[in-house]
Amino acid sequence: MAYRVLGRAGPPQPRRARRLLFAFTLSLSCTYLCYSFLCCCDDLGRSRLLGAPRCLRGPSAGGQKLLQKSRPCDPSGPTPSEPSAPSAPAAAVPAPRLSGSNHSGSPKLGTKRLPQALIVGVKKGGTRAVLEFIRVHPDVRALGTEPHFFDRNYGRGLDWYRSLMPRTLESQITLEKTPSYFVTQEAPRRIFNMSRDTKLIVVVRNPVTRAISDYTQTLSKKPDIPTFEGLSFRNRTLGLVDVSWNAIRIGMYVLHLESWLQYFPLAQIHFVSGERLITDPAGEMGRVQDFLGIKRFITDKHFYFNKTKGFPCLKKTESSLLPRCLGKSKGRTHVQIDPEVIDQLREFYRPYNIKFYETVGQDFRWE
């Protein structure tokens, strides 16, 4: 009898073991789900606190789904099984206030636009000074380098040209400087085709002094070139000036101006005196600002005269703790030229100068 009781009690033992194993497995699963849920909530709380979407990197798929429902996830890249989606628009950020310098402000602030104003000439006339001075104005954004679009790079197209420009706000003017435009035959037509409303700035200087400065710059790069006198004349005894030499031809301003007046009225061309830019920079820049239709922000308080260089420099500003002068090449000592050569060139330029004065309605007093 005892044998039977013991024999019947034996079979239920495997069922108890299975029940215990099932209960243990269920307990582990519940623990794992609770752990995953707590991790998800912790990451979600941090994401909300930091104000940016977070992606759960753990193994819990449930946690990932909960995060995706709560906030958009922005991982570094889509997984192979997911198509890429357009990113959500960023929250609006208050625009920082632009200071007077063109070098300040967010690089992505504003829009890249084609220039509304160009400094088109002339070489060695003072164009770099005008560019650096006008860049102080908060309503002007200028390209620092010379793009040479309308003379050398026109084939690249206007989209390429626009891509070079600094970003500007609606209230700002985009400007660039390339002095060789003034003597480029195709430049007026090309600029007109871009915009017939483009404002043009031409910095002019005594053509004899300009030619000597041009030669001095070339000599510093090519010390083996002929003398200034040798390049200026075909026959000095007869006084035959070589107008094929670029340094001489650039100074025949009225001839180049005729090409521009075929496309632009004189009211759209402003002439800056290179001489007055040295003696009265605030006055000349005041007229430039009037021409561009912006307030007179640049005044006497922005300049001081550098006796070593012999021309005005910018005082320190809010964006620059140090005064700004033009580069070392500016203000270099000119080569000594025979006074008789200078007199001959003055006589050569005289009729061109007079015609230029009459055309633009200004007497630059170069005689």
From Swiss-Prot:
Positions that bind 3'-phosphoadenylyl sulfate: 124-128, 205, 213, 330-334
Residue numbers on the Lumenal membrane side: 40-367
GO BP annotations listed: glycosaminoglycan biosynthetic process; heparan sulfate proteoglycan biosynthetic process
GO molecular function, one term: sulfotransferase activity
Main localization (coarse): Golgi
Disulfide bridges in this chain: 313-325
Spans traversing the lipid bilayer: 20-39
Residues at which substrate binds: 146-152, 177-180, 245-246
PANTHER family the UniProt entry points to: HEPARAN SULFATE GLUCOSAMINE 3-O-SULFOTRANSFERASE 2, HEPARAN SULFATE SULFOTRANSFERASE
Protein name: Heparan sulfate glucosamine 3-O-sulfotransferase 2
Taxonomic source organism: Homo sapiens (Human)
